[in-house]
């Protein structure tokens, strides 16, 4: 929030863009993920609110999908015993089947949005 607030004057004058990294956990329930999911839902709401309050700034929240990150590794190797069994199996299966995206894939999409996102996408939660 502080970063957004600090950047707003420059973003207004440049008609800049804010791209938030959200998650499927913002709209789906996972046992033991309450705080994480709530924080991502807040980002989605903030993007929507900023689209109204800051019309010169394009603000988007994006769900990049299942990405092969340190968080995914920790879900499989560290937290699998505290997660719901079905959820733990789901995330392990994504890795085993090659179903995780490389970080560069959503990274390129998000970089492109940061440079060229159309104003019509402001306030949207992209999946």
Indicate residue ranges for each PLM-predicted region.
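A short helix-coil junction within the Rossmann-fold of NAD(P)-dependent oxidoreductases
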Residues: 6-15
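Active-site loop immediately N-terminal to the catalytic Tyr-X3-Lys motif
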Residues: 28-34
């Amino acid at each position: 929030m502080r970063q957004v607030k600090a950047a707003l004057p420059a973003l207004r004058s440049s008609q800049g863009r804010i791209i938030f990294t959200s998650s499927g956990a913002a709209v789906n329930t996972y046992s033991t993920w309450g705080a994480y999911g709530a924080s991502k839902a807040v980002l989605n709401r903030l993007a929507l609110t900023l689209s109204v309050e800051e019309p010169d700034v394009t603000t988007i929240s994006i769900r990049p999908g299942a990405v092969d990150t340190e968080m995914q590794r920790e879900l499989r190797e560290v937290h699998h015993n505290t997660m719901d069994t079905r959820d733990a199996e789901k995330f392990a299966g994504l890795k085993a089947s090659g179903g995780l995206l490389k970080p560069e894939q959503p990274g390129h999409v998000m970089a492109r949005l940061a440079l060229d996102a159309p104003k019509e996408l402001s306030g949207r939660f992209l999946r």
